[in-house]
């Protein structure tokens, strides 16, 4: 149930100028939007309960680095994406995570390295859990945007080859 969940409900959003997407990400907004529409339809036809490309990757990385309970990745990574082309041709993209289970004190957050990571993010003070949730959501947004752009630009496999992952 994505309406009555535990944890934090968080949304991250961005509007990327068409020029930036084309020059930096090698992917025009229209092409990424079209891919997103295909992906959404595929998820719907497969009976998926979410439509993110890989929320779990960013969430897992942040959870391990910042002392979160990694067992909560499964529940936390069920989320939604939304995209549109703005009237001036820019790309609007958002991610919604309805049940992000995070904390900034207790448990693994007290481990030295994990606490240092939270400190670097400015999330060790009491009451900073909402800020941390926003940072995690921004990480997810960037990951999904990067993956989608790399696939559309036909650079996903070549980047893995270049960086040695497929050796």
Question: Which residues does each predicted region cover?
Answer:
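Internal helix-turn-beta structural module
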Residues: 92-167
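Glycine-rich anion/phosphate-binding loop at the beta-strand->alpha-helix junction
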Residues: 1-109
